[in-house]
C-alpha cells in the first residue's frame, strides 16, 4: 500500500516530510491544500467571514464582506497565522514532537478548532499525558461542522473527515517506527 493511500496525505506533503522539511514548511503546504488561498472574503462552512487561508482577522480587524487582499498581503497574513499556530503548539503541548507532528497538531488545534475548544478536549488531555495514539484517535472525533455530521456526504462537509484523518496521521507521524 503506498503512503498516499495509507495516510491520505498529498505527494507534496509526503515529499516535504521525506526531505526533512520544517514544521512551517509542512504546515504551509498542508494548509494551502486544505484551506486554499482566497484573496476575496468568503464565508466558511459555519458562516464566518474569512480570507486567505481562513483568517478571520487582518491587521486586528474582522474580515468583512467584499474585503479583497493582494496575494502578497495574504502571504503575510498566512505567515502570521501559521506562526501563531505553531507557537501555540510549542507553548501548550508538553511532549516532544517531530516537525510533522507539530504541523498536524497546529492544523487541528489552534488553526482549525481553536484553542477554546482544544483546551478542554480529550485530544489535549491525552497528548499531554503522553497517550499519543489515544490523542490521534481523538482528533478523528472532530467531524462536525456547524452541527452537521460530516460523515454524511449529503451534508457537504465530508472534507472535514478526510482532514481529520490527515491531521491525525501527521500528529502521530513516526510513532509506529
Swiss-Prot record:
- Any idea which residues are catalytic in this one? 35, 44
Q: What class of enzyme is it?
A: hydrolase
Q: Print the keywords alphabetically.
A: Antimicrobial, Bacteriolytic enzyme, Cytolysis, Glycosidase, Host cell inner membrane, Host cell lysis by virus, Host cell membrane, Host membrane, Hydrolase, Membrane, Signal-anchor, Transmembrane, Transmembrane helix, Viral release from host cell
Please state where this protein is localized: Host cell inner membrane
Q: Which GO terms describe its molecular function?
A: lysozyme activity
- GO terms for biological process, alphabetical: cell wall macromolecule catabolic process; defense response to bacterium; killing of cells of another organism; peptidoglycan catabolic process
Q: Which family does it belong to?
A: Belongs to the glycosyl hydrolase 24 family.
What is this protein's record name?
SAR-endolysin
Q: Which organism is it from?
A: Enterobacteria phage H19B (Bacteriophage H19B)
